Amino acid sequence: MSILVLADHDNGQLAGATLNTVAAATQIGGDIHVLVAGDSSGDVAKAAAAVAGVSKVLVAADASMNHGIAENVAPVIQGLASGYSHLLAPATTTGKNIMPRVAALLDVMQISDIISVVDANTFQRPIYAGNAIATVKSDEAVKIITVRSTAFEAVAAEGGSAAIEDVASGNDSGLSSYVKSELSSSERPELTSAPIVISGGRGMQDGSNFAMLEKVADKLGAAVGASRAAVDAGFVPNDYQVGQTGKVVAPDLYVAVGISGAIQHLAGMKDSKVIVAINKDDEAPIFQVADFGLVADLFEAVPEFEKAL
């Protein structure tokens, strides 16, 4: 049994979510190969070869593979599929774009966003915004799977010594083309990988009040997030959003400030190791999942918290 993992990367660095996906592959069992797509991905291939548990790295080195254009990458995976029992990718923007196309090309079902491996054919995934867990069994000859990275402990980034091989890259389909990327930059940790996250909700009342959270974040070395209500209200940009339609996080500490706790938000953060909630409404749903709760006016509690740090 062999497993192919699609590497998530930016042509310079291997994304951490790939290490979590390899961890899921390890639980399935079998030889683990990693596919790196991109014409300037030599450093990424070397990093993938060093990942613990990986026995081979395949490199599709062609300009058409750059930027993870699904219409170009999916046929390459299709061409490799016959040699594998499982095809895995992180449930990131890239993985969610490419893997359904691979499933369609192979005419097999996809199992999305798994959080647990029961056995080589059976997996668990959240449904109903995380309020229920579905156990899904697949009898397909090739299983197409996306992995929720926060559900699996990352394997070691070093210790492996996999062989690196080139594979046929295919041609540019001409169906889509890369235009540009607009990347936000911050001195704070990336939201999905930060060990501490402090998020604000509609209770913040105004975008300028997020400065209170930023002061706390600066002292804790934390990332700043937000609920969809805060994003929709224009308090902060969309890339702050945590939840079912935003980013899924599972930090060591998650602090929810002025967030009521709609199920869509809980779906994106309920796997956090420790959850702290600050809200003046003692019946807010967020307190049902919080390990520690403070019923207080956030405009008094947060400044006091910041001064105490």
Give the location of each predicted region.
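N-terminal glycine-rich FAD/FM-binding segment characteristic of electron-transfer flavoproteins
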Residues: 1-309
